């Protein structure tokens, strides 16, 4: 009888440990969400990709004009996915920070990515945890990090490009260039 009690006592200690190994930390769960996002994009699986976003999510692309609601972003990406065209971004490095809130329901991240098309890229964003425990992307921003030594030349080229675009728009419309967009 003593052996049976000892066995039961040891099982009671082991079962919680085994369960803990199966339960990911919030940071691991967020990493899995982001890994799934990149895998779905590479496989052009639109439904799986967009299911990872919160309903009011925003995607900020690399062009200064690209600030898309989820609906707008779907309008851009779904035709590509429907043709089997996705995009490949492989995480090289990732940092996840969980907000110090009692709910443990908000986190932000930054990740360095290897892009099949663009080389080194960076993704940053915010995730929120739903009532059911799933992490959803509330904001994702994609950028191209520029080495500091190249920044003066590249930002100069961007400035020249924008001036040429503004001049072309002014000539074609007969209107002055628009004022810079204000953030709300």
Residue ranges and their predicted role:
Residues 124-134:
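Short beta-strand segments and strand-loop junctions that repeat across beta-rich extracellular domains
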Residues 26-45, 162-165:
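Short, aromatic-enriched amphipathic alpha-helices that serve as compact interaction elements
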Residues 22, 29, 59, 72-120, ...:
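Surface-exposed, charged secondary-structure patches
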Residues 6-15:
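Bacterial N-terminal signal peptides
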Residues 1-4:
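Positively charged n-region of N-terminal signal peptides that target proteins for export
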Residues 130-131, 138-184:
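Low-complexity, intrinsically disordered terminal/linker segments enriched in charged
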Residues 43-56, 60:
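Short, well-ordered alpha-helical segments enriched in acidic and aromatic residues
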Residues 18-20:
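Boundary at the C-terminal end of the N-terminal hydrophobic targeting segment
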